[in-house]
């Protein structure tokens, strides 16, 4: 129910075209920022440049539109609505759903429409709280600059210098990816797919590897507080779940799996079972942290 479809449509005079259907698009990624340069016969000699950033301190993001020689009266129609699929597999983050699942329904019931004038040189669109809004130029500039400052600091925190100019940008890209899986307490399982908390996933190696030792310590402290210490192992092996063809341990406190020493998947919780046993991964990451 929280998934939204956002789309843009460009209008010049009595003609319009979806923004992703323009004749030419140059798309680039730079360590947490996407940029697009768009041209089309509909624009004549005009050029539309778009820069997109996520907010560093809230769920949301901002588009900056920069116009050059655009036709007079050009408009950008902005739409946000519910998505077509009513139910998604694993929140839709694993690519297991139909290709059109995130498209707008043919007859949206919750669609909102905004018009952005492209007569100036710069304009902004913000998405926050699952809604679009068109901020004033001063506010938009402030929000964009704040987000760009954060992005730039993250990018510059890890620098690689080699004779290969195509390899060197990986430092900033790696730092941006690492920041994307940090939720304030722990390193998440993944940034898009599997964006969930797991105590021993491989992401926890990244903190010390790129020099973010404070985040690494926060992660390990958070999960050290999730280790079970008051449930002795009273049920001997075998304790596999017959309903699952012995493929997993039966979820019952007191088994060798779910007893003292077991680390739960959510920080600061000691009462949560999960089919993974990630103790070995967590301890290996912790030892590498001590080594650093």
Predicted regions and their residues:
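An extended acidic
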Residues: 1-41, 126-159, 163
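Detector for glycine-centered tight turns/loop "hinges" at secondary-structure junctions
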Residues: 14, 43-45, 261
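Short small/polar-residue motifs
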Residues: 18-26, 45-51, 109-114
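Short, surface-exposed loop/turn motifs at beta-strand boundaries within globular domains
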Residues: 29-31, 56-60, 196-199
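Low-complexity, acidic Ser/Thr/Pro/Gly-rich terminal tails and inter-domain linkers that flank the onset
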Residues: 37-56
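Polysaccharide-binding surfaces and accessory modules of carbohydrate-active proteins
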Residues: 50-133
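Preference for long, amphipathic alpha-helical scaffolds in soluble/luminal domains
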Residues: 89, 102-119, 127-164, 168-181, ...
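Substrate-binding groove/exosite segments of carbohydrate-active enzymes
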Residues: 149-292
């Amino acid at each position: 129910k929280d998934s939204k479809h956002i789309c843009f449509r460009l209008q010049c005079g009595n003609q319009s075209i979806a923004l992703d259907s323009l004749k030419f698009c140059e798309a680039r990624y730079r360590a947490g920022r996407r940029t697009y340069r768009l041209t089309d016969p509909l624009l004549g000699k005009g050029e539309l440049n778009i820069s997109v950033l996520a907010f560093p301190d809230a769920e949301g993001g901002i588009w900056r539109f920069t116009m050059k020689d655009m036709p007079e009266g050009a408009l950008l129609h902005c739409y946000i609505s519910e998505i077509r699929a009513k139910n998604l597999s694993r929140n839709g983050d694993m690519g297991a759903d139909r290709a059109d699942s995130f498209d707008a329904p043919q007859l949206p019931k919750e669609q909102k429409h905004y018009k952005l004038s492209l007569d100036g040189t710069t304009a902004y669109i913000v998405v926050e709280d699952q809604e679009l809004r068109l901020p004033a130029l001063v506010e938009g500039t402030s929000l964009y600059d704040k987000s760009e400052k954060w992005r730039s600091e993250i990018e510059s925190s890890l620098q690689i210098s080699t004779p290969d100019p195509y390899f060197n940008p990986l430092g900033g890209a790696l730092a941006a990816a690492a920041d994307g899986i940090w939720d304030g307490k722990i390193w998440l399982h993944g940034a898009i797919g599997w964006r969930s908390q797991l105590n021993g996933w491989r992401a926890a190696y990244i903190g010390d590897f790129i020099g973010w030792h404070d985040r690494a310590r926060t992660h390990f402290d958070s999960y050290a507080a999730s280790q079970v210490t008051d449930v002795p192992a009273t049920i001997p092996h075998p304790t596999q779940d017959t309903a699952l063809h012995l493929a997993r341990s039966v979820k019952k406190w007191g088994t060798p799996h779910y007893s003292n020493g077991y680390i739960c998947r959510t920080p600061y919780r000691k009462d949560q079972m999960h089919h993974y046993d990630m103790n070995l991964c967590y301890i290996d990451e912790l030892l590498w942290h001590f080594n650093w």
